[in-house]
Amino acid sequence: MKLMETLNQCINAGHEMTKAIAIAQFNDDSPEARKITRRWRIGEAADLVGVSSQAIRDAEKAGRLPHPDMEIRGRVEQRVGYTIEQINHMRDVFGTRLRRAEDVFPPVIGVAAHKGGVYKTSVSVHLAQDLALKGLRVLLVEGNDPQGTASMYHGWVPDLHIHAEDTLLPFYLGEKDDVTYAIKPTCWPGLDIIPSCLALHRIETELMGKFDEGKLPTDPHLMLRLAIETVAHDYDVIVIDSAPNLGIGTINVVCAADVLIVPTPAELFDYTSALQFFDMLRDLLKNVDLKGFEPDVRILLTKYSNSNGSQSPWMEEQIRDAWGSMVLKNVVRETDEVGKGQIRMRTVFEQAIDQRSSTGAWRNALSIWEPVCNEIFDRLIKPRWEIR
């Protein structure tokens, strides 16, 4: 069998498998089939809205809120919980929805590393969904990653639903004046995505040539920042997922970000890999005019293990000694639920009761991601815009 024939068979079989997984999970392989079926109990909803459970009951009784969805369990009628849409409506009724001030640019959070397998996309996706769960308007951007994993999490399968013209590529190459054409909705209210596909790798070979031809409106390394500026007014926060490399695309992510989060597993070789990332990034940026776009850098320890014999606690101590306040307080502990979430095409924030491995495993995963996302919000996002 010739190589091209082999590759075509692999590609076709891979697309069919992806479709089959989506159909098994959502009864359809279209992005529109993605639904959040999770319901939040009244106490959980109250915490998200920022009021008491009694305040919600009183508002429902007074007609300020709709009567809650109910179901019969045995002989008892009980609440089935609230959808995220209903929770956002509560925020509007109680006046607790968070918004940045109109005259403040939305914080841009970039997540980058120069190797795969460090939970980079998991961090980007969980952070974006957590911010949407908080009621914010969020744009998740596949800045330069042709793999499109963040897109797949939200039902947009690269090279099946998404092609070159649907990505940032036309803007990068000077063919579009803004990026509204590339924005796609997700099943999360308030969360949009700019997806990617394999064609996005062309920026590494074509971007500099377009600049030399005078076809770009700004310097090549500032194109992503310019892209974000064309749509920033519609969002409270922007999250960028980066490719695991140090090409011109990653330089764009660095220059577009207000905060650059570098996921770093608490293992020796991964620590040295992060050090190499900083070393190479410094060398690449030596002769680049950043035009004032210089992000704050933070380290997020990932794949942390508390098991007997694990090197994670020792490595955490070394990393904190070396990088001090750059290292975030919370860590992403290792859990099988991250991998299982990929198979389910759902993060821990989306999973309904019947979509979890077990209640205990789900709660453990939630206890990992919530503190991490809350710390990023409280320390790195809130200070950058006024909350009204």
From Swiss-Prot:
Q: Name one Pfam family in it.
A: AAA_31
The question of whether Aminoacyl-tRNA synthetase is a record keyword is answered with: no
State what this protein does.
This protein is essential for plasmid partition. It ensures the proper distribution of newly replicated plasmids to daughter cells during cell division. SopA is trans-acting.
Family classification: Belongs to the ParA family.
Gene3D superfamilies xrefs? P-loop containing nucleotide triphosphate hydrolases
GO process annotations (BP): plasmid partitioning
The name of this protein is: Protein SopA
- Cite the InterPro entries for this sequence: AAA_dom, DNA_Partitioning_ATPase, P-loop_NTPase
Q: What keywords appear on the UniProt entry?
A: Plasmid, Plasmid partition
Originating organism? Escherichia coli O157:H7
